[in-house]
Amino acid sequence: HYHLKTPLLDWSHSFFVALYFAFEDLEPEQEKYRVIYQLNDFLPPEQDVIITPKIKIGARINSQNGVFTKLTSYHLEELASYNRPEYLGKGVPFISKYLISSKLRMDVLNFLASINIDPYTIYPDLLGKMKACEIGIDNAIAEINLEYQD
């Protein structure tokens, strides 16, 4: 969205890309957990919520393996109500929520970088270069803070 507000919510077919987005920002470290939602592709036909662009609209959506939904928090809760045995079929819930400790931020980002998931690959443009610099600065500050704690 290039930081424009839209009614669309970004999703990725890649767990690792979702993990990157969950840990990208430094600020939520005050929060105990980062959250990743998993939306099942095999929703009931009346729940046509996943929007896949017919044409690739830019390098970002390609590199992020992205799709969109037009869901409010109310709609997410409604989908969660389908997580009942009579709807589950093969036992796969329609929406799942994963909580991961915010304390793992640097470990997660370092792991993702080791498998080539970083700002350069997520944002293959100038923003990616800027975000890579920000993460480098965050890392340097975190290391300095650790030295002062010892």
Regions found by a protein language model. Name each.
Residues 1-150:
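Catalytic-core elements of nucleic-acid end-processing and repair enzymes
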